[in-house]
Every structure is written in structure tokens, then in C-alpha cells.
């Protein structure tokens, strides 16, 4: 019985590791994309750079932004809003990654 349990645990750990690999790579890609496309106005930590604050860039760590739906954030990234340019040329999975990354910036 113990041998079966050991095999099940080993398989489960290996499976979890394999599943985590693409997610980690995706998270790294989203982080790099955020730094290249968003951090200029929103800063690396999401609180807003000096220039971004002057232009009205949102602080991604606030409850207001974190309370937006994924669809709302996706729409803003895709189509722009106010002074924020649109990024509709990004792939859907890149935009989804940015939304997920923004979620990690909450206070």
C-alpha cells in the first residue's frame, strides 16, 4: 500500500511541475511585456510614474483598478482610454497575461 501511495505522490508532483512550467514562462513574458509597454507610465510596481501621474495614469495597486473586471481591463488595454494608447496589436494571450500581471500588483 505504501508503495502505491509513493507512486501516486511522485506522479502528482511531477505532473504539477510540468504544468507549472508554461505558467512560469507566461508570467515572465507578461512581466517583461509590462515593463516594456506599461511601466513608463504606470511604473514597475504599478503605482504610477511621475510622468504617468501627470497624465492621469491609474495606480494598479488600488481597489478601484483591482475591482475592475478582466473584461474591463482587457478593453482598456486593447482600445486605450483617455491618454492611454491602444495596444490592440498585442496578441490576445499577451493581453490576458498583462491582465493577470496587473492582478499581482494589488496592495
Language-model features: where?
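C-terminal capping alpha-helices of c-type cytochrome domains
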Residues: 75-77, 88-107
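Post-cleavage N-terminal segment of exported redox proteins
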Residues: 1-27, 72, 90, 104-107
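Hydrophobic alpha-helical segments typical of transmembrane helices
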Residues: 29, 45, 69-72
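Periplasmic c-type cytochrome electron-transfer domains
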Residues: 71-81, 85
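Electron-transfer interface patches adjacent to heme c in soluble/periplasmic c-type cytochromes
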Residues: 58-71, 86-94
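Periplasmic/extracellular electron-transfer cofactor-ligation site
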Residues: 31-57, 79-83, 104-107
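Hydrophobic packing within well-folded, soluble alpha/beta domains
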Residues: 38-41, 73, 98
